[in-house]
């Protein structure tokens, strides 16, 4: 999968942009505020219908306009087919329109399935030390793209969670009514856990294999690594209905459900100690890099899909050697990679390193304008 061309209008400081993006590796350099991250934001919008920079999509629309439009043409090389994606946002009425081949998409998940996009930002490298939400999203992104039924199960579970929370907040709770909701809630929760557990077992196996094959340093981490996925319950071997029943009083006081898939988390330990306590910042980055590479490998094995990877400010958290390693492994797995770089010399170095083996393009970004530097 790859984007062959993009066209953005009124996306932050990008007033109008048309770009051939058919290369495997695309490097964008420019000063802070030049529009590099906005360009990646536009590509991300094509695959997610949302922004990775803000929860309020209106902020992505130029302050000089009421409407933003992002267009992309993607090519599935294996199937020999191309398709078009369009995402627009109007500030007036806060209206977002999504079209695939001219037809309105009913849900954003249709967009995500059509154009798998994985993003790596400086925040990504807080995976180990950050909150559990980011780690859950990491797992669910992977499951969504390899298990087609997961979306339906997740949506049904989410509706039940919201309904249960509404009932808890009402203060007018019938135990029999709550029990009826809980039966369905537990059933869907357990199904989500089964999908996650199966995916995570495969991810863990590939991750450890990847670490052991990379270098002596990562091999040592792989030998001592234990990575586990908790499913959001107090105890997995204790009946989940009983656990929900015992937590009702606490849930009523808090006004929300405290047990279930939304409380799941990943624990990473090395030699039995939390990774953040024993791994240097550099070692943590290496481990997280291998996690994302393992996710790409599962996608390749299970679906033969090759996603689009966006890397924002690659030099912020990785030195040159690790940048080359990350990009090499991603390109080897068939990904199309968009990279933003602050330093022109670094961009030129990466271009020179990769251009002989992979079709590489380099661009300069300034005040929302993008100029091709190398073919």
From Swiss-Prot:
Compartmental location: Cytoplasm
Keyword Cell wall biogenesis/degradation carried by entry: no
GO molecular function: ATP binding; single-stranded DNA binding
GO biological process: DNA replication; DNA synthesis involved in DNA repair; double-strand break repair; SOS response
Keywords assigned: ATP-binding, Cytoplasm, DNA damage, DNA repair, DNA replication, DNA-binding, Nucleotide-binding, SOS response
SUPFAM superfamilies attached to this UniProt entry: P-loop containing nucleoside triphosphate hydrolases
InterPro entries, sorted: DNA-binding_RecF, DNA-binding_RecF_CS, P-loop_NTPase, RecF/RecN/SMC_N, RecF_2
Pfam family, one: SMC_N
Domain of life: Bacteria
GO cellular component: cytoplasm
Residue sites binding ATP per the record: 30-37
Purpose of the protein: The RecF protein is involved in DNA metabolism; it is required for DNA replication and normal SOS inducibility. RecF binds preferentially to single-stranded, linear DNA. It also seems to bind ATP.
Similarity section: Belongs to the RecF family.
UniProt protein name: DNA replication and repair protein RecF
Primary gene name: recF
């Amino acid at each position: 999968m790859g984007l062959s061309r993009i066209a953005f209008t009124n996306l932050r400081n990008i007033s109008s942009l048309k770009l051939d993006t058919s290369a495997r590796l695309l490097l964008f350099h420019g000063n802070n505020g030049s529009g590099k991250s906005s360009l990646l934001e536009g590509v991300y919008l094509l695959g997610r219908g949302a922004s990775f920079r803000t929860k309020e999509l209106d902020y992505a629309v130029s302050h000089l306009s009421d409407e933003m439009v992002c267009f992309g043409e993607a090519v599935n090389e294996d199937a020999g087919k191309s398709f078009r994606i369009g995402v627009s946002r109007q500030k007036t009425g806060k209206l977002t329109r999504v079209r695939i081949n001219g037809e309105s998409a009913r849900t954003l998940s249709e967009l995500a399935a059509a154009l798998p996009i994985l993003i790596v930002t400086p925040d990504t490298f807080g995976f180990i030390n950050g909150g559990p939400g980011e780690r859950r999203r990491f797992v669910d992104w992977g499951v969504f793209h390899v298990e087609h039924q997961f979306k339906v199960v997740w949506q049904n579970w989410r509706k039940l969670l919201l309904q249960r929370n509404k009932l808890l907040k009402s203060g007018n709770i019938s135990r029999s009514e709550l029990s009826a909701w809980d039966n369905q809630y537990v059933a869907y929760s357990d199904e989500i856990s089964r999908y996650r557990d199966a995916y995570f077992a495969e991810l863990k196996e590939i991750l450890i294999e990847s670490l052991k094959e990379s270098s002596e340093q990562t091999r040592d981490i792989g030998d001592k690594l234990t990575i586990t996925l908790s499913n959001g319950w107090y105890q997995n071997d204790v009946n989940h209905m009983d656990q929900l029943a015992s937590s009702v009083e606490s849930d009523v006081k808090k006004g929300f459900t405290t047990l279930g898939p939304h409380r799941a988390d990943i624990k990473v330990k090395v030699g039995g100690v939390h990774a953040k306590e024993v791994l240097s910042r550099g070692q943590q980055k290496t481990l997280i890099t291998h996690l994302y590479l393992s996710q790409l490998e599962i996608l390749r094995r299970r679906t033969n899909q090759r996603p689009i990877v966006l890397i924002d400010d690659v030099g912020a958290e990785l030195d040159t050697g690790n940048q080359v390693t990350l990009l090499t492994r991603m390109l080897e797995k068939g990904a199309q990679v968009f990279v933003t770089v602050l330093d022109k010399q670094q961009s030129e170095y990466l271009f020179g390193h990769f251009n002989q083996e992979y079709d590489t393009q380099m661009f300069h970004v300034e005040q929302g304008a993008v100029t091709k530097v190398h073919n």
